[in-house]
């Protein structure tokens, strides 16, 4: 398609219309949502075809919904598939482009994503799930759908705020299509990809979610939502008990996310070559699948397996433990995908076990295991991905039960708060943290990083030799000519700063060397520093202005930056960002 070409731009007249009319952005959002629905249908069909060919399951069946698997296929397909993935990843490493996640794109890059990188991530996700690795397709769905939306925005040269919103529209359409939940998809876009709610974004994101849902349903014959069975009415005490389940889900979610990082560290410490790590992970997943086929792929099919929640609690606990281990090993060994789908199955199984255990201890409670499967599913997913309203609306659209949704809301709020308090990350931002990024969500902080000292400094600085005396300085820089003058040595290196008013003080002898009245000789800022870092430096050094040097070692003067100018530029940028967020620009 034309917008896959990074050099493609639509004609100027059409771009002008889109930038001038809000309704035009809604049209682009609808297009992004429809494309997201096609992405969901296409990737789902590709994975289903791989399962059909590689594992020999019946057409229309789901891999994780199988009661038994061919032992040879269960062992060989994930291991050989992992080996091929490792070889392919190593081969394409030089030209795959930047793989920018939608959250990272909106937080740091103003919504700009690489189409090539998004296609590769989507292909790796399809392959990983297709060969049976315990990974979720949602990562590939949102990556490719958001990448297409970003490319549409780049073709129309949308403003930064509109670009970020359109990326959120792509993700919203993908999640709405994947779960059959347009409201849940819309709030996924708001909470996790855009990072905020705004009236101006409601129509575009809502339209994208609706089109994503309708398109996916049109091209996918079976329902992609979650089957829950029949739910009975909840009692008042269920609301309170749901909060306890939310706390437990938060703790397990933290362990699950840390487990993936620990698995990666274990492979690294064992000095296992990255090219063969997926193969080793595939072998272990295959062994686990011999015990329970529900551990394979995303686990979406297991949620459709009507009898899974009717199994004895020991069997449910076994599936729960094996699925958690398979997910940790799959992601930790290098398979591509997400943890969202796995957390749905794990949370549902955990909720069932929780309700069954409580009923065994206190039969008078008469908890409904099916209802607690929904509560546990929502609470664990929020601990892993964030987005409390996303999961609340998915639960509502799945069950149509407002009373149950109230219990879900209590559970997800507590789960989210405990996870934020004791861990501080979702699975996505935890991965960013492990590679050195400091972002905690999709809120736009890229403008802060873009506003650097190099952009704000004055390059036309006035300097004076540090060997001069006060008399020579007074003659060269009369009172009122400037506020500060930078002193440099014979090699042009920064030596300190002279305050003009202080140098002209009557009580200061004219023969005084400038070296005796230098300020901030050891205090400088660097051109790559952000405005926030510069403001912190002014406060730390108690300076009204600081010299800008090329490096701490060379100390060649590049310019001068004042605190007042920095604060003004930062305030202007903040106000511009606020207006974009509210749709005033």
Kindly give the residue locations of the regions a language model identified.
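Alpha-helical transmembrane segments and immediately membrane-proximal extracytoplasmic
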Residues: 1-450, 454, 459-460, 464-476, ...
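Short, intrinsically disordered terminal tails adjacent to the first/last structured region
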Residues: 1-5, 551-552, 580-585
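Short hydrophobic beta-strand motif reused across regulatory alpha/beta modules
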Residues: 187, 393, 495-503, 558-566
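Ordered, small/hydrophobic-rich secondary-structure cores
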Residues: 351-357, 505-507, 519
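Bateman (tandem CBS) regulatory domains
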Residues: 438, 448-462, 468, 496-499, ...
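The conserved cystathionine-beta-synthase
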Residues: 464-482, 488-489, 505-510, 524-551, ...
